[in-house]
Amino acid sequence: MSYSIGIDYGTASGRVFLINTTNGQVVSKFVKPYTHGVIESELNGLKIPHTYALQNSNDYLEIMEEGISYIVRESKIDPDNIVGIGIDFTSSTIIFTDENLNPVHNLKQFKNNPHAYVKLWKHHGAYKEAEKLYQTAIENNNKWLGHYGYNVSSEWMIPKIMEVMNRAPEIMEKTAYIMEAGDWIVNKLTNKNIRSNCGLGFKAFWEEETGFHYDLFDKIDPKLSKVIQDKVSAPVVNIGEAVGKLDDKMAQKLGLSKETMVSPFIIDAHASLLGIGSEKDKEMTMVMGTSTCHLMLNEKQHQVPGISGSVKGAIIPELFAYEAGQSAVGDLFEYVAKQAPKSYVDEAANRNMTVFELMNEKIKHQMPGESGLIALDWHNGNRSVLSDSNLTGCIFGLTLQTKHEDIYRAYLEATAFGTKMIMQQYQDWHMEVEKVFACGGIPKKNAVMMDIYANVLNKKLIVMDSEYAPAIGAAILGAVSGGAHNSINDAVDAMKEPILYEINPEAEKVQRYETLFKAYKALHDIHGYKKANIMKDIQSLRVEG
Protein backbone atom coordinates (compact mmCIF):
# COMPACT_ATOMS: atom_id res chain seq x y z
CA MET A 1 0.00 0.00 0.00
CA SER A 2 1.36 3.43 -0.93
CA TYR A 3 0.33 6.97 -0.06
CA SER A 4 0.94 10.48 -1.32
CA ILE A 5 0.75 13.90 0.28
CA GLY A 6 -1.16 16.79 -1.27
CA ILE A 7 -0.44 20.26 0.10
CA ASP A 8 -3.02 22.87 -0.89
CA TYR A 9 -2.14 26.52 -0.34
CA GLY A 10 -5.30 28.61 -0.59
CA THR A 11 -5.93 32.31 -0.08
CA ALA A 12 -6.57 32.25 3.66
CA SER A 13 -5.41 28.83 4.82
CA GLY A 14 -3.32 25.79 3.98
CA ARG A 15 -4.23 22.10 3.94
CA VAL A 16 -2.08 18.96 4.08
CA PHE A 17 -3.71 15.67 3.05
CA LEU A 18 -2.46 12.09 3.19
CA ILE A 19 -4.13 10.09 0.42
CA ASN A 20 -4.25 6.38 -0.40
CA THR A 21 -2.91 6.12 -3.96
CA THR A 22 -4.99 3.01 -4.70
CA ASN A 23 -8.47 4.39 -4.04
CA GLY A 24 -8.15 8.10 -3.19
CA GLN A 25 -9.20 7.60 0.42
CA VAL A 26 -8.32 10.52 2.70
CA VAL A 27 -6.27 8.90 5.46
CA SER A 28 -5.50 12.08 7.39
CA LYS A 29 -5.83 15.82 6.91
CA PHE A 30 -4.55 19.01 8.50
CA VAL A 31 -6.14 22.42 7.95
CA LYS A 32 -4.90 25.69 9.40
CA PRO A 33 -5.45 29.42 8.69
CA TYR A 34 -2.31 31.38 7.90
CA THR A 35 -0.91 32.97 11.05
CA HIS A 36 -0.60 36.38 9.38
CA GLY A 37 -3.62 35.93 7.11
CA VAL A 38 -3.94 38.24 4.13
CA ILE A 39 -2.18 41.56 4.73
CA GLU A 40 -4.53 44.11 3.16
CA SER A 41 -5.10 47.26 5.20
CA GLU A 42 -1.90 47.65 7.17
CA LEU A 43 1.55 46.12 7.55
CA ASN A 44 3.08 46.17 11.03
CA GLY A 45 0.80 49.07 11.94
CA LEU A 46 1.55 51.04 8.77
CA LYS A 47 -1.29 51.75 6.34
CA ILE A 48 -0.93 50.25 2.85
CA PRO A 49 -2.94 51.04 -0.33
CA HIS A 50 -6.35 49.39 -0.68
CA THR A 51 -5.23 47.66 -3.89
CA TYR A 52 -2.59 45.63 -2.02
CA ALA A 53 -2.91 42.00 -0.92
CA LEU A 54 0.24 40.55 0.66
CA GLN A 55 1.29 37.50 2.66
CA ASN A 56 4.11 36.36 4.91
CA SER A 57 5.87 33.33 3.40
CA ASN A 58 6.82 31.99 6.82
CA ASP A 59 3.17 30.94 7.12
CA TYR A 60 3.62 28.57 4.17
CA LEU A 61 6.50 26.72 5.81
CA GLU A 62 4.51 26.54 9.03
CA ILE A 63 1.65 24.81 7.20
CA MET A 64 4.01 22.35 5.51
CA GLU A 65 6.02 21.46 8.61
CA GLU A 66 3.16 21.28 11.11
CA GLY A 67 0.84 19.60 8.62
CA ILE A 68 3.17 16.81 7.51
CA SER A 69 4.22 16.13 11.09
CA TYR A 70 0.56 15.88 12.11
CA ILE A 71 -0.67 13.58 9.33
CA VAL A 72 2.25 11.16 9.73
CA ARG A 73 1.76 11.02 13.49
CA GLU A 74 -2.03 10.83 13.38
CA SER A 75 -2.21 8.20 10.61
CA LYS A 76 0.58 6.00 12.01
CA ILE A 77 1.59 5.31 8.39
CA ASP A 78 5.17 4.18 7.81
CA PRO A 79 6.87 7.18 6.12
CA ASP A 80 8.62 4.76 3.76
CA ASN A 81 5.19 4.10 2.21
CA ILE A 82 4.68 7.77 1.35
CA VAL A 83 5.95 7.85 -2.22
CA GLY A 84 5.33 11.43 -3.31
CA ILE A 85 4.38 15.00 -2.45
CA GLY A 86 2.34 17.31 -4.68
CA ILE A 87 1.85 21.05 -4.21
CA ASP A 88 -0.91 23.33 -5.42
CA PHE A 89 -0.92 27.07 -4.82
CA THR A 90 -2.90 30.22 -5.57
CA SER A 91 -1.46 32.08 -8.54
CA SER A 92 0.01 34.39 -9.46
CA THR A 93 1.33 34.61 -5.91
CA ILE A 94 4.97 35.62 -6.19
CA ILE A 95 7.90 35.73 -3.81
CA PHE A 96 11.26 37.51 -3.84
CA THR A 97 14.22 35.63 -2.32
CA ASP A 98 17.98 35.84 -1.86
CA GLU A 99 20.41 33.32 -3.38
CA ASN A 100 19.62 30.82 -0.57
CA LEU A 101 15.86 30.97 -1.23
CA ASN A 102 15.30 33.06 1.91
CA PRO A 103 12.47 35.59 1.42
CA VAL A 104 13.71 39.18 1.40
CA HIS A 105 10.85 40.28 3.67
CA ASN A 106 12.71 38.46 6.47
CA LEU A 107 15.59 40.92 6.16
CA LYS A 108 15.44 43.45 9.01
CA GLN A 109 15.73 46.49 6.75
CA PHE A 110 12.68 45.42 4.72
CA LYS A 111 10.38 44.47 7.60
CA ASN A 112 8.04 47.40 6.90
CA ASN A 113 8.40 47.52 3.12
CA PRO A 114 5.28 46.02 1.51
CA HIS A 115 7.11 45.32 -1.76
CA ALA A 116 9.38 42.83 0.00
CA TYR A 117 6.44 40.61 0.94
CA VAL A 118 4.67 37.91 -1.04
CA LYS A 119 2.32 39.50 -3.57
CA LEU A 120 -0.86 37.42 -3.34
CA TRP A 121 -2.83 36.57 -6.49
CA LYS A 122 -5.43 39.25 -5.72
CA HIS A 123 -2.84 42.02 -5.24
CA HIS A 124 -3.89 44.72 -7.72
CA GLY A 125 -1.18 47.27 -7.00
CA ALA A 126 0.43 46.70 -10.41
CA TYR A 127 -2.52 47.91 -12.49
CA LYS A 128 -0.51 50.71 -14.16
CA GLU A 129 2.24 48.26 -15.08
CA ALA A 130 -0.33 45.83 -16.49
CA GLU A 131 -1.81 48.58 -18.64
CA LYS A 132 1.64 49.51 -19.97
CA LEU A 133 2.36 45.87 -20.86
CA TYR A 134 -0.96 45.58 -22.64
CA GLN A 135 -0.64 48.81 -24.62
CA THR A 136 2.92 47.97 -25.67
CA ALA A 137 1.90 44.48 -26.81
CA ILE A 138 -0.99 45.90 -28.85
CA GLU A 139 1.16 48.63 -30.41
CA ASN A 140 3.74 46.03 -31.44
CA ASN A 141 1.11 43.64 -32.79
CA ASN A 142 2.22 40.77 -30.55
CA LYS A 143 -0.09 38.09 -31.96
CA TRP A 144 0.78 35.66 -29.17
CA LEU A 145 -1.19 37.92 -26.81
CA GLY A 146 -4.24 36.04 -28.08
CA HIS A 147 -3.05 33.03 -26.09
CA TYR A 148 -3.66 35.15 -22.99
CA GLY A 149 -7.11 36.34 -23.98
CA TYR A 150 -5.76 39.56 -25.54
CA ASN A 151 -5.26 41.03 -22.10
CA VAL A 152 -2.76 41.58 -19.32
CA SER A 153 -3.89 41.28 -15.71
CA SER A 154 -2.38 43.10 -12.76
CA GLU A 155 -2.70 39.74 -10.96
CA TRP A 156 0.02 38.18 -13.16
CA MET A 157 3.72 37.85 -12.43
CA ILE A 158 5.34 40.30 -14.86
CA PRO A 159 3.30 43.38 -13.83
CA LYS A 160 4.10 42.61 -10.19
CA ILE A 161 7.80 42.40 -10.99
CA MET A 162 7.60 45.73 -12.82
CA GLU A 163 5.84 47.21 -9.80
CA VAL A 164 8.78 46.33 -7.56
CA MET A 165 11.29 47.55 -10.16
CA ASN A 166 9.50 50.89 -10.38
CA ARG A 167 8.61 51.50 -6.74
CA ALA A 168 11.15 49.59 -4.67
CA PRO A 169 14.41 49.14 -6.62
CA GLU A 170 16.20 48.48 -3.33
CA ILE A 171 14.16 45.26 -3.03
CA MET A 172 15.06 44.19 -6.55
CA GLU A 173 18.72 44.84 -5.83
CA LYS A 174 18.68 42.37 -2.92
CA THR A 175 16.60 39.80 -4.83
CA ALA A 176 18.37 36.84 -6.42
CA TYR A 177 15.28 34.86 -7.46
CA ILE A 178 11.66 35.65 -8.24
CA MET A 179 9.18 32.81 -8.51
CA GLU A 180 5.66 31.63 -7.87
CA ALA A 181 5.21 30.76 -4.20
CA GLY A 182 4.33 27.23 -5.35
CA ASP A 183 7.71 26.92 -7.04
CA TRP A 184 9.35 28.24 -3.87
CA ILE A 185 7.82 25.46 -1.74
CA VAL A 186 8.93 22.83 -4.27
CA ASN A 187 12.43 24.29 -4.32
CA LYS A 188 12.60 24.35 -0.53
CA LEU A 189 11.58 20.68 -0.46
CA THR A 190 14.14 19.59 -3.07
CA ASN A 191 16.91 22.19 -2.66
CA LYS A 192 16.65 22.99 -6.37
CA ASN A 193 15.84 26.07 -8.43
CA ILE A 194 13.24 25.02 -11.00
CA ARG A 195 9.96 26.37 -12.35
CA SER A 196 6.66 24.67 -13.17
CA ASN A 197 5.33 24.97 -16.72
CA CYS A 198 1.87 25.59 -15.24
CA GLY A 199 2.83 28.73 -13.31
CA LEU A 200 5.14 30.19 -15.96
CA GLY A 201 2.80 29.40 -18.82
CA PHE A 202 -0.28 31.00 -17.35
CA LYS A 203 1.21 33.92 -15.44
CA ALA A 204 4.57 34.95 -16.94
CA PHE A 205 4.30 35.14 -20.76
CA TRP A 206 6.27 31.92 -21.21
CA GLU A 207 5.58 29.28 -23.87
CA GLU A 208 7.22 25.90 -24.29
CA GLU A 209 8.27 26.53 -27.90
CA THR A 210 9.53 30.10 -27.53
CA GLY A 211 10.31 30.60 -23.84
CA PHE A 212 9.75 34.08 -22.38
CA HIS A 213 8.53 36.82 -24.69
CA TYR A 214 11.60 39.03 -24.43
CA ASP A 215 10.43 40.88 -27.55
CA LEU A 216 7.79 42.53 -25.38
CA PHE A 217 10.00 42.97 -22.31
CA ASP A 218 12.69 44.75 -24.35
CA LYS A 219 10.14 47.25 -25.63
CA ILE A 220 9.06 48.01 -22.06
CA ASP A 221 12.55 48.29 -20.58
CA PRO A 222 15.74 46.32 -21.35
CA LYS A 223 16.21 46.09 -17.58
CA LEU A 224 12.99 44.05 -17.40
CA SER A 225 14.39 41.44 -19.78
CA LYS A 226 17.54 41.19 -17.68
CA VAL A 227 15.53 40.75 -14.46
CA ILE A 228 13.49 37.96 -16.06
CA GLN A 229 16.62 36.33 -17.46
CA ASP A 230 18.63 36.52 -14.24
CA LYS A 231 15.99 36.09 -11.54
CA VAL A 232 12.99 34.26 -13.05
CA SER A 233 14.36 31.99 -15.77
CA ALA A 234 15.29 28.49 -14.58
CA PRO A 235 14.93 24.87 -15.75
CA VAL A 236 11.26 24.04 -16.36
CA VAL A 237 9.57 20.85 -15.15
CA ASN A 238 6.24 19.87 -16.71
CA ILE A 239 3.13 18.72 -14.91
CA GLY A 240 3.22 14.92 -14.78
CA GLU A 241 6.99 14.80 -14.33
CA ALA A 242 9.01 14.66 -11.12
CA VAL A 243 11.24 17.45 -9.83
CA GLY A 244 13.29 15.01 -7.76
CA LYS A 245 13.68 13.53 -4.31
CA LEU A 246 13.28 15.33 -1.01
CA ASP A 247 16.43 17.10 0.10
CA ASP A 248 18.13 15.04 2.85
CA LYS A 249 17.85 17.78 5.47
CA MET A 250 14.22 18.46 4.60
CA ALA A 251 13.38 14.74 4.75
CA GLN A 252 14.88 14.55 8.22
CA LYS A 253 13.06 17.69 9.34
CA LEU A 254 9.69 16.44 8.06
CA GLY A 255 10.15 12.86 9.21
CA LEU A 256 9.83 11.46 5.70
CA SER A 257 11.90 9.09 3.59
CA LYS A 258 14.72 10.58 1.50
CA GLU A 259 13.26 8.57 -1.39
CA THR A 260 10.01 10.59 -1.37
CA MET A 261 9.53 12.24 -4.77
CA VAL A 262 8.23 15.77 -5.33
CA SER A 263 6.14 16.94 -8.28
CA PRO A 264 6.17 20.46 -9.78
CA PHE A 265 3.57 22.80 -8.36
CA ILE A 266 0.24 23.23 -10.10
CA ILE A 267 -2.12 26.21 -9.79
CA ASP A 268 -4.74 25.42 -7.15
CA ALA A 269 -7.80 25.65 -9.38
CA HIS A 270 -6.10 23.51 -12.02
CA ALA A 271 -5.39 20.82 -9.45
CA SER A 272 -9.14 20.61 -8.87
CA LEU A 273 -9.73 19.24 -12.37
CA LEU A 274 -7.55 16.29 -11.47
CA GLY A 275 -9.23 15.93 -8.09
CA ILE A 276 -12.71 15.64 -9.58
CA GLY A 277 -11.72 13.65 -12.67
CA SER A 278 -12.38 16.16 -15.46
CA GLU A 279 -9.91 15.00 -18.13
CA LYS A 280 -11.73 15.68 -21.42
CA ASP A 281 -12.81 18.52 -23.66
CA LYS A 282 -16.39 19.89 -23.70
CA GLU A 283 -16.40 19.94 -19.89
CA MET A 284 -16.30 23.26 -18.03
CA THR A 285 -15.26 23.04 -14.40
CA MET A 286 -16.03 25.80 -11.92
CA VAL A 287 -13.60 25.79 -9.02
CA MET A 288 -15.43 27.90 -6.47
CA GLY A 289 -13.86 29.50 -3.43
CA THR A 290 -12.93 33.09 -2.62
CA SER A 291 -12.88 33.50 -6.40
CA THR A 292 -14.01 31.17 -9.20
CA CYS A 293 -11.85 29.70 -11.96
CA HIS A 294 -13.58 28.35 -15.07
CA LEU A 295 -11.38 25.71 -16.65
CA MET A 296 -11.57 23.74 -19.87
CA LEU A 297 -9.36 21.32 -21.81
CA ASN A 298 -9.03 21.16 -25.58
CA GLU A 299 -6.83 19.49 -28.17
CA LYS A 300 -6.31 22.80 -29.99
CA GLN A 301 -5.15 26.24 -28.95
CA HIS A 302 -7.85 28.82 -29.64
CA GLN A 303 -7.32 32.53 -29.09
CA VAL A 304 -10.27 33.32 -26.83
CA PRO A 305 -10.59 37.03 -25.93
CA GLY A 306 -11.01 37.82 -22.25
CA ILE A 307 -9.74 34.56 -20.77
CA SER A 308 -6.66 34.31 -18.58
CA GLY A 309 -4.62 32.04 -20.81
CA SER A 310 -4.14 28.71 -22.55
CA VAL A 311 -1.14 26.48 -21.92
CA LYS A 312 -0.30 23.07 -23.37
CA GLY A 313 0.25 20.34 -20.80
CA ALA A 314 -0.44 22.53 -17.77
CA ILE A 315 -3.00 20.03 -16.41
CA ILE A 316 -3.11 16.99 -18.72
CA PRO A 317 -0.16 16.28 -21.06
CA GLU A 318 -0.87 17.04 -24.74
CA LEU A 319 -4.10 18.96 -24.00
CA PHE A 320 -4.34 22.73 -23.84
CA ALA A 321 -5.63 23.98 -20.51
CA TYR A 322 -7.80 27.11 -20.59
CA GLU A 323 -8.51 29.38 -17.63
CA ALA A 324 -11.01 32.17 -17.13
CA GLY A 325 -12.35 33.49 -13.87
CA GLN A 326 -14.22 35.79 -11.54
CA SER A 327 -12.23 37.70 -8.93
CA ALA A 328 -14.83 37.78 -6.16
CA VAL A 329 -17.28 34.97 -5.37
CA GLY A 330 -16.90 33.56 -1.87
CA ASP A 331 -15.32 36.86 -0.82
CA LEU A 332 -18.37 38.68 -2.18
CA PHE A 333 -20.85 36.49 -0.31
CA GLU A 334 -18.82 36.89 2.87
CA TYR A 335 -18.96 40.65 2.38
CA VAL A 336 -22.76 40.53 2.06
CA ALA A 337 -23.09 38.29 5.13
CA LYS A 338 -21.06 40.75 7.20
CA GLN A 339 -23.54 43.51 6.28
CA ALA A 340 -26.50 41.51 7.61
CA PRO A 341 -28.77 43.38 10.06
CA LYS A 342 -28.33 42.53 13.72
CA SER A 343 -31.79 40.93 13.77
CA TYR A 344 -30.61 38.41 11.16
CA VAL A 345 -27.42 37.66 13.06
CA ASP A 346 -29.40 37.15 16.27
CA GLU A 347 -32.01 34.94 14.57
CA ALA A 348 -29.30 32.78 13.03
CA ALA A 349 -27.55 32.42 16.39
CA ASN A 350 -30.79 31.56 18.21
CA ARG A 351 -31.57 28.88 15.62
CA ASN A 352 -28.01 27.51 15.68
CA MET A 353 -27.40 28.24 12.00
CA THR A 354 -25.14 30.50 9.96
CA VAL A 355 -26.26 33.78 8.42
CA PHE A 356 -25.80 32.11 5.01
CA GLU A 357 -28.16 29.28 5.96
CA LEU A 358 -30.72 31.79 7.20
CA MET A 359 -30.60 33.85 4.01
CA ASN A 360 -30.77 30.73 1.84
CA GLU A 361 -33.90 29.70 3.73
CA LYS A 362 -35.44 33.11 3.08
CA ILE A 363 -34.74 33.09 -0.68
CA LYS A 364 -35.12 29.45 -1.66
CA HIS A 365 -38.77 29.80 -2.72
CA GLN A 366 -38.30 33.09 -4.61
CA MET A 367 -38.71 32.99 -8.36
CA PRO A 368 -36.08 34.62 -10.57
CA GLY A 369 -36.68 38.37 -10.78
CA GLU A 370 -39.01 38.47 -7.79
CA SER A 371 -36.81 40.92 -5.87
CA GLY A 372 -36.52 43.37 -8.77
CA LEU A 373 -32.75 43.57 -8.29
CA ILE A 374 -29.79 42.96 -10.53
CA ALA A 375 -26.12 43.38 -9.63
CA LEU A 376 -22.66 43.57 -11.17
CA ASP A 377 -20.32 41.33 -9.18
CA TRP A 378 -17.13 43.34 -9.74
CA HIS A 379 -16.23 44.08 -6.13
CA ASN A 380 -12.69 42.83 -6.79
CA GLY A 381 -12.58 43.87 -10.44
CA ASN A 382 -13.53 41.77 -13.46
CA ARG A 383 -11.11 39.04 -14.53
CA SER A 384 -13.11 37.58 -17.41
CA VAL A 385 -14.22 38.59 -19.91
CA LEU A 386 -13.50 42.31 -19.37
CA SER A 387 -10.03 41.81 -17.84
CA ASP A 388 -10.19 45.02 -15.83
CA SER A 389 -9.23 44.96 -12.16
CA ASN A 390 -10.26 48.63 -11.77
CA LEU A 391 -13.96 48.00 -12.26
CA THR A 392 -16.20 48.03 -9.19
CA GLY A 393 -19.52 46.48 -8.23
CA CYS A 394 -23.01 47.93 -8.56
CA ILE A 395 -26.54 46.96 -7.59
CA PHE A 396 -29.64 48.19 -9.41
CA GLY A 397 -33.33 48.22 -8.49
CA LEU A 398 -33.10 49.05 -4.79
CA THR A 399 -36.26 50.36 -3.12
CA LEU A 400 -37.30 51.11 0.45
CA GLN A 401 -38.84 47.63 0.51
CA THR A 402 -35.64 45.79 -0.46
CA LYS A 403 -34.60 43.21 2.13
CA HIS A 404 -31.10 42.03 2.88
CA GLU A 405 -31.77 38.54 1.54
CA ASP A 406 -32.85 40.13 -1.77
CA ILE A 407 -29.43 41.75 -2.05
CA TYR A 408 -27.80 38.42 -1.21
CA ARG A 409 -29.77 36.64 -3.93
CA ALA A 410 -28.94 39.36 -6.45
CA TYR A 411 -25.24 38.74 -5.84
CA LEU A 412 -25.66 34.96 -6.14
CA GLU A 413 -27.37 35.55 -9.48
CA ALA A 414 -24.73 38.08 -10.56
CA THR A 415 -21.94 35.54 -10.14
CA ALA A 416 -24.01 33.04 -12.14
CA PHE A 417 -24.52 35.61 -14.90
CA GLY A 418 -20.78 36.33 -14.88
CA THR A 419 -20.17 32.61 -15.32
CA LYS A 420 -22.61 32.53 -18.23
CA MET A 421 -20.67 35.35 -19.91
CA ILE A 422 -17.54 33.20 -19.63
CA MET A 423 -19.27 30.03 -20.86
CA GLN A 424 -20.67 31.86 -23.88
CA GLN A 425 -17.22 33.28 -24.63
CA TYR A 426 -15.76 29.77 -24.73
CA GLN A 427 -18.60 28.61 -26.97
CA ASP A 428 -18.28 31.59 -29.32
CA TRP A 429 -14.64 30.60 -29.92
CA HIS A 430 -15.22 26.97 -30.92
CA MET A 431 -15.19 25.32 -27.50
CA GLU A 432 -18.52 23.60 -26.89
CA VAL A 433 -19.70 23.11 -23.31
CA GLU A 434 -21.71 19.93 -22.74
CA LYS A 435 -21.09 19.34 -19.03
CA VAL A 436 -20.59 21.75 -16.15
CA PHE A 437 -18.89 20.62 -12.95
CA ALA A 438 -18.87 22.59 -9.70
CA CYS A 439 -16.37 21.88 -6.95
CA GLY A 440 -15.16 23.48 -3.76
CA GLY A 441 -16.63 24.17 -0.36
CA ILE A 442 -19.30 26.59 -1.62
CA PRO A 443 -21.11 24.22 -4.04
CA LYS A 444 -21.07 21.47 -1.44
CA LYS A 445 -22.71 23.71 1.17
CA ASN A 446 -25.04 25.87 -0.92
CA ALA A 447 -27.66 23.96 -2.92
CA VAL A 448 -29.74 27.12 -3.43
CA MET A 449 -26.85 28.75 -5.24
CA MET A 450 -26.28 25.66 -7.38
CA ASP A 451 -29.96 25.67 -8.40
CA ILE A 452 -29.54 29.27 -9.54
CA TYR A 453 -26.45 28.36 -11.57
CA ALA A 454 -28.11 25.38 -13.28
CA ASN A 455 -31.01 27.53 -14.43
CA VAL A 456 -28.93 30.55 -15.44
CA LEU A 457 -26.53 28.37 -17.47
CA ASN A 458 -29.34 26.10 -18.70
CA LYS A 459 -27.05 23.12 -18.20
CA LYS A 460 -27.11 20.05 -16.01
CA LEU A 461 -24.84 20.90 -13.13
CA ILE A 462 -22.71 18.16 -11.58
CA VAL A 463 -21.74 19.05 -8.02
CA MET A 464 -18.75 17.15 -6.73
CA ASP A 465 -18.17 15.92 -3.19
CA SER A 466 -15.01 17.93 -3.29
CA GLU A 467 -14.45 20.55 -0.65
CA TYR A 468 -10.75 19.73 -0.90
CA ALA A 469 -10.39 18.89 -4.60
CA PRO A 470 -7.14 20.89 -5.03
CA ALA A 471 -5.43 18.87 -2.29
CA ILE A 472 -6.60 15.63 -3.93
CA GLY A 473 -5.32 16.86 -7.29
CA ALA A 474 -1.95 17.75 -5.77
CA ALA A 475 -1.76 14.30 -4.16
CA ILE A 476 -2.51 12.74 -7.55
CA LEU A 477 0.55 14.48 -9.00
CA GLY A 478 2.56 13.36 -5.99
CA ALA A 479 1.45 9.78 -6.63
CA VAL A 480 2.51 9.99 -10.28
CA SER A 481 5.91 11.49 -9.42
CA GLY A 482 6.41 8.72 -6.86
CA GLY A 483 5.64 5.95 -9.35
CA ALA A 484 2.37 4.78 -7.79
CA HIS A 485 0.68 5.25 -11.19
CA ASN A 486 2.08 5.24 -14.72
CA SER A 487 0.20 8.33 -15.89
CA ILE A 488 -1.91 11.22 -14.66
CA ASN A 489 -4.99 9.67 -16.27
CA ASP A 490 -4.45 6.38 -14.42
CA ALA A 491 -3.99 8.23 -11.13
CA VAL A 492 -7.10 10.35 -11.70
CA ASP A 493 -9.23 7.28 -12.43
CA ALA A 494 -8.09 5.67 -9.17
CA MET A 495 -8.07 8.69 -6.85
CA LYS A 496 -10.72 11.19 -8.03
CA GLU A 497 -13.53 12.35 -5.77
CA PRO A 498 -17.17 11.21 -6.18
CA ILE A 499 -20.24 13.09 -7.42
CA LEU A 500 -22.34 14.59 -4.61
CA TYR A 501 -25.49 15.45 -6.58
CA GLU A 502 -26.74 16.71 -9.94
CA ILE A 503 -29.22 19.50 -10.74
CA ASN A 504 -31.21 19.80 -13.97
CA PRO A 505 -32.52 23.18 -15.19
CA GLU A 506 -36.26 23.94 -14.95
CA ALA A 507 -37.91 25.45 -18.04
CA GLU A 508 -39.83 28.25 -16.29
CA LYS A 509 -36.80 29.41 -14.29
CA VAL A 510 -34.58 29.22 -17.37
CA GLN A 511 -36.98 31.48 -19.29
CA ARG A 512 -37.15 34.06 -16.49
CA TYR A 513 -33.38 34.05 -16.15
CA GLU A 514 -32.98 34.69 -19.88
CA THR A 515 -34.81 38.00 -19.36
CA LEU A 516 -32.65 38.86 -16.35
CA PHE A 517 -29.48 37.89 -18.19
CA LYS A 518 -30.29 40.32 -21.01
CA ALA A 519 -30.50 43.09 -18.41
CA TYR A 520 -27.23 41.92 -16.81
CA LYS A 521 -25.47 41.87 -20.18
CA ALA A 522 -26.71 45.37 -21.00
CA LEU A 523 -25.39 46.71 -17.69
CA HIS A 524 -22.20 44.67 -18.13
CA ASP A 525 -21.53 46.29 -21.52
CA ILE A 526 -22.43 49.82 -20.39
CA HIS A 527 -20.33 49.83 -17.23
CA GLY A 528 -17.62 47.52 -18.56
CA TYR A 529 -17.11 49.03 -22.03
CA LYS A 530 -19.14 52.06 -23.00
CA LYS A 531 -19.25 54.03 -19.74
CA ALA A 532 -16.54 52.33 -17.69
CA ASN A 533 -15.11 55.74 -16.87
CA ILE A 534 -18.04 56.43 -14.50
CA MET A 535 -16.85 53.89 -11.93
CA LYS A 536 -13.20 54.65 -12.53
CA ASP A 537 -13.66 58.40 -12.03
CA ILE A 538 -15.25 57.72 -8.65
CA GLN A 539 -12.45 55.33 -7.71
CA SER A 540 -9.83 57.92 -8.64
CA LEU A 541 -11.21 60.17 -5.90
CA ARG A 542 -10.71 57.34 -3.43
CA VAL A 543 -7.11 56.78 -4.52
CA GLU A 544 -6.27 60.47 -4.45
CA GLY A 545 -8.19 61.37 -1.29
From Swiss-Prot:
Gene3D superfamilies on file: 1.20.58.2240, 3.30.420.40
SUPFAM superfamilies for this protein: Actin-like ATPase domain
Keyword S-adenosyl-L-methionine appears in the UniProt entry: no
Lineage top rank: taxon: Bacteria
Keywords: Arabinose catabolism, ATP-binding, Carbohydrate metabolism, Kinase, Nucleotide-binding, Transferase
Record-level Gene Ontology MF annotations: ATP binding; D-ribulokinase activity; ribulokinase activity
Catalytic reaction annotation: D-ribulose + ATP = D-ribulose 5-phosphate + ADP + H(+); L-ribulose + ATP = L-ribulose 5-phosphate + ADP + H(+)
InterPro entries: ATPase_NBD (IPR043129), Carb_kinase_FGGY (IPR000577), FGGY_C (IPR018485), FGGY_N (IPR018484), Ribulokinase (IPR005929)
A GO cellular-component term linked to this record: cytoplasm
Biological process per Gene Ontology, one example term: L-arabinose catabolic process to xylulose 5-phosphate
EC number: 2.7.1.16
CDD domains, sorted: ASKHA_NBD_FGGY_L-RBK
Pathway: Carbohydrate degradation; L-arabinose degradation via L-ribulose; D-xylulose 5-phosphate from L-arabinose (bacterial route): step 2/3
Root EC class: transferase
Family stated for the protein in its record: Belongs to the ribulokinase family.
Protein's name according to its UniProt entry: Ribulokinase
Organism whose genome encodes this protein: Staphylococcus aureus (strain MSSA476)
Lineage: Bacteria, Bacillati, Bacillota, Bacilli, Bacillales
GN (gene name): araB
